[in-house]
Amino acid sequence: MDSVISRNGKPIRLTDERWAHITEEHCELAGLRIEVLETVENPDKVFQGNSEELIAVRELEKGKFLAIIYREFPRDGFIITAFLTRRIKSLSRRKQIWSR
């Protein structure tokens, strides 16, 4: 298990089980575990998710973004899923919580 500190100062966990699930659904993320953690810790932007979750976004290369869905609680939180996208406009329609 790994953890990083979110923009809100909460430790966010990424368990081995969750990482296995993420890479099973999104095989293109295999080998990007460090980048996933770094995106939560040092995102370009954070958006509000559908309910209680947050979406940390970071541009990996020109026009290619890594999006991490995670949940925070009063003491800590955890990563739910992650994906690569080029459709930043669809994420930008959401309420922006934080920006670099």
Could you say what each language-model-derived stretch is?
Residues 1-100:
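Ribonuclease/tRNase effector modules and their secretory precursors
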